[in-house]
Design a protein with these regions (language model features):
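General beta-strand structural signal in soluble alpha/beta enzymes
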Residues: 22-26
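Long, positively charged amphipathic alpha-helical accessory segments at protein N-termini or as interdomain linkers
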Residues: 3-21, 32-164
C-alpha cells in the first residue's frame, strides 16, 4: 500500500505541475526540486487493515523557519490558490489509478520512475551508507554497501551528499 499511496500522491502533485520534477523520496515524501510538498504515513494495526495519512501542502505560504527540510506548497509552485476540494478529487482519482496499476502489475515500474536518488550515494539515519540501487516489490530500499547488498524496510534516508 505505501507504493500505491506514493504514486497516487506524486501523480496528484504532477497533475497541477506537469512541468515540474516532482518525485518520491523514499520512504514517504513527495518533493519538488528537493522541497517537500507532501508526506505519507501508512500503518497496519492488524492483518489486512491499513491506515494512510497524507499531508499535502496546498495553499500554505508561510512555514516555520526551524524545519529540518525546505518545504513548498502547490500554491507556491503554481502561483494559484487552489480549491482543496479540487485537490482532493484529483487525489482520489490518482489513488484509484494507482490501485489499477497495482492490479495490472504496472505499479512498481511507475514507482521506480518517480523515485529520486537512484544511483546516488545515500546515508541511512543509522549512519550506514550505500548506493541506492532500487526499490523491491515490497517497497524495501535496495542499497549496495561496502559489505554487500542490503534491503531496508523502514527509516529515513538522506539524499544529501555525504561530507567529504
Amino acid at each position: 500500500l505505501p507504493l500505491v499511496i506514493g504514486v497516487g500522491v506524486c501523480n496528484t502533485v504532477r497533475s497541477f505541475l506537469p512541468w515540474s520534477s516532482a518525485g518520491l523520496k523514499w520512504p514517504n515524501d513527495v518533493r519538488i526540486d528537493g522541497r517537500k510538498v507532501a508526506g505519507i504515513l501508512v500503518e497496519s494495526p492488524g492483518p489486512g487493515v491499513y491506515l494512510a495519512g497524507i499531508g499535502l501542502n496546498v495553499n500554505q505560504v508561510d512555514f516555520p523557519e526551524d524545519l529540518a527540510i525546505e518545504p513548498t506548497s502547490l500554491m507556491l509552485e503554481t502561483a494559484d490558490r487552489l480549491r482543496r476540494a479540487d485537490v482532493f478529487d484529483r487525489l482520489m482519482d490518482a489513488l484509484d489509478d494507482a490501485l489499477d496499476m497495482l492490479e495490472r502489475g504496472d505499479l512498481l515500474p511507475a514507482y521506480r520512475s518517480l523515485l529520486e536518488g537512484r544511483g546516488a550515494e545515500v546515508q541511512l539515519e543509522d549512519g550506514r551508507r550505500g548506493v541506492m540501487k532500487d526499490v523491491d516489490a515490497s517497497g524495501g530500499l535496495v542499497l549496495e554497501t561496502g559489505t554487500g547488498v542490503i534491503v531496508v524496510h523502514s527509516g529515513d534516508v538522506s539524499l544529501r551528499p555525504p561530507p567529504a
